[in-house]
């Protein structure tokens, strides 16, 4: 994590060898940071469409991340955000890729945090097989609701494919509802969930860094959990814009660039 290369944006970035290296690193590590991206309003949509197709949601084609009154999500406050994945309530899957573009950031605090859910899952399996088994087999209800929208989905906190391989994590404690189950199983489940949360919040797995204006972070929302430290909105401005993409379009871009550069 700590040796991830930062990339530099340029006018010829879209079909460049730099873009190819960016996508290779993204699929290897789960996130990349691109510097010197123009801070024009909603430029991240243009960037997103360079590498795939921006996915429209109930939040729009893109969304603003800044403190505001009466928010429908904690992201729109100055509070700290513990590690989580976005949109776990979408069916069948949450958006695969999230882009966050820093427009302004002159506050104290407000650092970005990332946790590799795949690494945590592997370590949880070694630490306690029973916890791993119950978290990969118990579906919980995820729900989002505001005055305009209700979204629900049932899924495991850790989803495996039919061969038992890691597929994705869905973790957002404010949005999940545990189903009814026998008391003994429920106790194991809550202990397992707490253990998982403790791992996600451990300094051993978390990296913390500051996004500066012009920095754009692209992360795998199926693998990476993200968060932020708290900040004081009275000290300055912290303004990011975000959007989502799906894997098929970025994988197509990667294949196109591999063919172009004979790799």
Residue map of PLM features:
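Active-site environment of non-heme Fe oxygenases that use a 2-His-1-carboxylate facial triad
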Residues: 1-31, 36-37, 41-263
């Amino acid at each position: 994590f700590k040796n991830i290369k930062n990339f530099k944006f340029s006018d010829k970035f879209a079909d460049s060898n730099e873009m190819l290296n960016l996508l290779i690193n993204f699929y290897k590590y789960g996130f990349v940071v691109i510097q010197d991206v123009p801070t024009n309003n909603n430029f991240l949509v243009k960037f997103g469409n360079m590498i795939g197709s921006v996915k429209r949601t109930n939040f729009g084609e893109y969304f603003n991340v800044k403190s505001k009154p009466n928010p429908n999500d904690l992201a729109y406050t100055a509070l700290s955000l513990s590690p989580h994945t976005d949109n776990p309530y979408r069916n069948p899957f949450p958006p695969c890729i999230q882009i966050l573009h820093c427009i302004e950031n002159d506050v104290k605090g407000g650092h970005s945090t990332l946790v590799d859910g795949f690494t945590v899952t592997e370590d949880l399996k070694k630490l306690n097989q029973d916890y791993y088994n119950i978290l990969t087999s118990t579906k919980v209800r995820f729900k989002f609701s505001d005055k305009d929208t209700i979204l629900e989905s049932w899924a495991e906190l850790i989803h495996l494919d039919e061969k038992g391989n890691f597929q994705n994590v869905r973790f957002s404690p404010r949005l999940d509802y545990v189903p009814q189950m026998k008391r003994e199983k429920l106790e194991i489940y809550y202990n397992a969930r707490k253990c998982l949360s403790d791992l996600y919040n451990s300094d051993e797995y978390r990296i913390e860094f500051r996004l500066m204006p012009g920095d754009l972070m692209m992360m795998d929302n199926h693998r990476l959990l993200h968060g932020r430290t708290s900040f004081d909105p009275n000290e300055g401005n912290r303004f990011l814009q975000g959007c989502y993409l799906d894997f098929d379009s970025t994988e197509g871009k990667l294949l196109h660039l591999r063919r172009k550069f004979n790799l």
